[in-house]
Regions:
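Membrane-proximal, proline-rich intrinsically disordered regions
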Residues: 20-68, 96, 230, 259
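Structural recognition of the beta-strand scaffold that forms the well-ordered cores
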Residues: 129, 149, 272-276
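Bacterial Sec-dependent N-terminal signal peptides
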Residues: 1-29
Length: 324
């Protein structure tokens, strides 16, 4: 037995002595730049397209619905006060700590992701949709906050604190959208799956133009709708005509309630120009129903969604009579 142990030990030492000693092996698990294969680039683009999904599914909805008087905050039994995060938008008395408006940084991160593609040496067909997404993120910052940073530089130079006047950002967006629109896809189905196409960029430009006098005003309190003139109105109408005349969209192809039902992804809804898809497994985050659900919905079996839910709804927002 002792002889066997000695032989095994000697054999092990010989293996160590003759083993690989050249450790200068190129590392292929680390890349100084993003891989440029089509699969890798599409994955990178998809991360840009879906970047805003989580915020869009809750905080963006809360900020828009509560501040526009469509809905108002409620606090049944003293719950869901959350420091006034839901009541402040309705009262137009925001605090920088409110979660309902604390997502400007997410838009900045989306611009950074887009810049990684835009500033690389990839083909222009990948850069154009990335520029469209960057314009979308920039538009939301400008539309919601007024002054906003123009994040069109390298990652190192992006600074969320270097804000530009709203009018300058609006003119930058106009120039950017006019440049990329001719080079984007005309496949309408792409827009319904969060992939930016020509019609998404055109619709974004139309939104920019229809509110042009507001964006050009020195400040919102200096804007007077009764006396303002819109130099971009004809251009806005022309863009809308182009979208309509494409024949790829139809407002009356199905009942309104089906367009926003749980199975609408299979219906090819023809009036959706640009949409963010959600599901319960790979694309989660849609919480629109939660805010308006019965607070103790988990006690219902089945609930009005057709199944028993393990958690209760939020029940912290209610629709105002004017919108009901």
């Amino acid at each position: 037995m002792k002889s066997n142990i000695k032989l095994m030990f000697a054999a092990g030492m010989m293996l160590l002595a003759t083993g690989c000693t050249d450790l200068d092996v190129p590392l292929k698990s680390q890349y100084p730049s993003y891989p440029n294969s089509e699969v890798a680039l599409n994955a990178q683009l998809n991360s840009i397209y879906s970047h805003f999904r989580g915020t869009l599914g809750r905080r963006f909805f809360e900020a828009m619905s509560l501040s526009s008087d469509e809905q108002t905050a409620v606090s049944y039994s003293g719950g869901w006060i959350d420091g006034g995060a839901y009541s402040h938008p309705s009262l137009h008395d925001f605090s920088y700590e409110d979660n309902t408006i604390d997502w400007m940084g997410e838009l900045g991160k989306g611009c950074v992701k887009a810049n990684e593609v835009i500033n690389s040496d990839v083909d222009a067909k990948y850069k154009m949709p990335a520029r469209a997404m960057r314009a979308y993120f920039e538009f939301l910052m400008m539309d919601c906050w007024g002054e906003a940073p123009i994040l069109d530089v390298t990652v190192e130079d992006n600074d969320m604190n270097k804000r530009q006047p709203r009018a300058i950002v609006a003119k930058y967006l106009e120039k950017e959208l006019l440049e990329i629109i001719p080079h984007l896809s005309t496949d309408a189905s792409e827009g319904r799956n969060s992939i930016p196409n020509k019609y998404m960029a055109q619709a974004l430009l139309a939104k920019l133009y229809i509110n042009w006098p507001v964006y050009m005003a020195a400040s919102v309190d200096k804007y007077d709708a009764s006396s303002a003139t819109n130099e971009k109105l004809d251009a806005c109408i022309s863009i809308c005509d182009d979208i309509i005349n494409s024949g790829k969209f139809n407002l009356g192809s199905m009942a309104y309630r089906f367009k926003f039902g749980p199975n609408n992804s299979a219906l090819n809804v023809e009036d959706f120009i640009y949409a963010m898809p959600y599901d319960t497994y790979t694309a989660t985050g849609m919480q629109y129903g939660r805010a308006n659900s019965y607070k103790d919905i988990k006690s219902m079996n089945p609930s009005y969604f057709g199944m028993k839910l393990s958690n209760s709804g939020g029940g912290y927002m209610t629709m105002t009579p004017e919108f009901a």
